[in-house]
Amino acid sequence: TNFGGERLKLFSGSCYLPHPDKEDTGGEDAHFICTDEQAIGVADGVGGWADVGVNAGLFAQELMSHSVSVIQEEPKDSINPARVLEKAHSCTKAKGSSTACIIALTDT
């Protein structure tokens, strides 16, 4: 994206610290950063699934992993976060659910 004649660049970082009670399972959340594609995403797994023996973190991790794959297949400057999430969800086989957000900085 151009701003005053200059191209914008997304700089991001992350740190993931699961709740101490959920460290053994790795927590219920997942995220990604695609530097070249200027996209980031986060999924917050629904912890209530633990009541029926499902690790919601696996769903969130798989959803974000598939999101990265979909983004890498998209044309670089036309990433559509809603489409990415829809495609990633259709590939996700783990049980569970999550809230999710994907953003991408593009020239369009």
Language model: regions and residue ranges:
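PP2C/PPM-type serine/threonine phosphatase catalytic domain
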Residues: 1-108
